Amino acid sequence: MVSTKGRYALRVMLDLAEHADEGFIPLKDIALRQEVSKKYLEIIVRDLVGGKLIRGSSGKGGGYRLCRRPQDYTVGEIIELTEGTLAPIACLAADAGNCPRKDRCKTLPFWHEFDTMVHDFFYSRRLSDLLSAQADEPATKK
């Protein structure tokens, strides 16, 4: 399951992509648009900067911006950076050691298939795909 942190990280990335032509975007502006606490977003952007997905600038005119074009980010890399592995079981995680039951585990093929589906789902979608889907949505009536 993707936590709030992962979902908000994706929203921050989308917000930065939508406002990419405005230069560095102040975190307070993102927080207002996304209706998320600025304090919580500070934790998330720290991870995104550390993972080299976004760049930060302090001072007047400072804020955050994408390091790459929206089409150069996968949803999977954003989610995994903030959530950790997407593997459904520990023995399929990239940093897992050799499982002693690997050769006789009857459920491993099932979990491996599920892991492949999840990985392919997240890594086949790009930030630009989410922007396009958002633009295609009809306006909601109030």
Stretch-by-stretch model annotation:
Residues 53-67:
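Beta-hairpin "wing" of winged helix-turn-helix
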Residues 63-80:
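Charged, amphipathic alpha-helical coiled-coil/dimerization segments
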Residues 75, 93-142:
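C-terminal regulatory/oligomerization modules of transcriptional regulators
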Residues 32, 49-50:
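Alpha-helical residues within the helix-turn-helix
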Residues 50-53, 81:
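Residue cluster at the C-terminal edge of the helix-turn-helix DNA-binding motif
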Residues 2-4, 10-37:
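N-terminal helix-turn-helix DNA-binding core of bacterial DNA-binding proteins
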